[in-house]
């Protein structure tokens, strides 16, 4: 694990972008993408760049269950707003939150991931240590699955909705087992509210109670944090 401390999320986005650029020059074909506020500056750097993604595949970590892709709170909408509309890919993949048969959707998404090994995975981290929507207690070897969102996650995401009652209670998420197969993982985290999770992830025991702690076992992980998020290291 390599930890890089930056002044702010703008600098963090630039460093994450530089790491991506290096991997693309080395032949990266598939990007694993995350949503939430942490990776936004990374996407802004991509949009400003001259990088061409027309021959590349993207695979997103997760999507809410029960929300249409056209809904402005869906992760599909988020990705189009922050990246896809400006930088077209050969193929974009997200779980279908409106799939009638979630078991079949899980099989479909696992097949997509298996057919497109992820070269570069961008991650955020939840206050409770979740990566993707893999909440505490999630088995480390799990692949795509339906998640019942933790109350802390629902509360954290409620700022994007009119009311906490509007926040979906379930999501489809790429599993930790799939995330760990990514060749390179870059995790970005900013703000004091992430400090406890960052410290536990890096210094604590490897335990399913802290999903991100499994990253200690990965061969190529870069953690980009501002001083606040790094304050308990």
UniProtKB/Swiss-Prot annotation:
Keyword Amino-acid biosynthesis: no
Active-site annotation: 62, 128, 130, 135
Keywords: Carbohydrate metabolism, Hydrolase
Gene Ontology molecular function: any one: glucosamine-6-phosphate deaminase activity
Record's protein name: Glucosamine-6-phosphate deaminase
Record organism: Streptococcus agalactiae serotype V (strain ATCC BAA-611 / 2603 V/R)
Record-linked InterPro entries: Glc/Gal-6P_isomerase (IPR006148), Glucosamine6P_isomerase (IPR004547), Glucosamine6P_isomerase_CS (IPR018321), NagB/RpiA_transferase-like (IPR037171)
Keyword Hydrolase: yes
GO CC, any one term: cytoplasm
UniProt xrefs under Gene3D superfamilies: 3.40.50.1360
Pfam family, one: Glucosamine_iso
Enzyme Commission designation: 3.5.99.6
PROSITE patterns: GLC_GALNAC_ISOMERASE (PS01161)
Gene Ontology biological process terms in this record: carbohydrate metabolic process; glucosamine catabolic process; N-acetylglucosamine catabolic process; N-acetylneuraminate catabolic process
Pathway: Amino-sugar metabolism; N-acetylneuraminate degradation; D-fructose 6-phosphate from N-acetylneuraminate: step 5/5
Domain of life of the native organism: Bacteria
HAMAP family in UniProt: GlcN6P_deamin
């Amino acid at each position: 694990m390599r930890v890089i401390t930056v002044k702010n999320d703008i600098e963090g986005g630039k460093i994450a972008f530089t790491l991506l650029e290096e991997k693309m020059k080395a032949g990266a074909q598939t990007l694993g993408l995350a949503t939430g506020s942490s990776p936004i500056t990374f996407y802004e750097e991509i949009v400003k760049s001259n990088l061409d993604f027309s021959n590349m595949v993207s695979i997103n970590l997760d999507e809410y269950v029960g929300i249409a892709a056209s809904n402005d709170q869906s992760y599909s909408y988020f990705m189009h707003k922050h990246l896809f509309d400006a930088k077209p890919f050969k193929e974009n993949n997200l779980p279908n939150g409106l799939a009638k048969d979630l078991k079949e959707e899980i099989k479909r998404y696992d097949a997509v991931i298996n057919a497109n090994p992820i070269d570069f995975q961008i991650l955020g981290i939840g206050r409770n240590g979740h990566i993707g929507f893999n909440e505490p207690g999630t088995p480390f070897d799990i692949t795509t699955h339906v998640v019942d969102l933790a109350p802390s996650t629902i509360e954290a995401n409620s700022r994007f909705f009119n009311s906490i009652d509007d926040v979906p209670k379930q999501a489809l998420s790429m599993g930790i087992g799939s995330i760990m197969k990514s060749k390179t993982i870059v995790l970005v985290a900013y703000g004091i509210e992430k400090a406890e999770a960052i410290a536990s992830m890096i210094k604590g025991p490897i335990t399913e109670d802290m999903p991100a702690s499994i990253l200690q076992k990965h061969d190529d992980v870069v953690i980009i944090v501002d001083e606040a998020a790094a304050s308990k290291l």
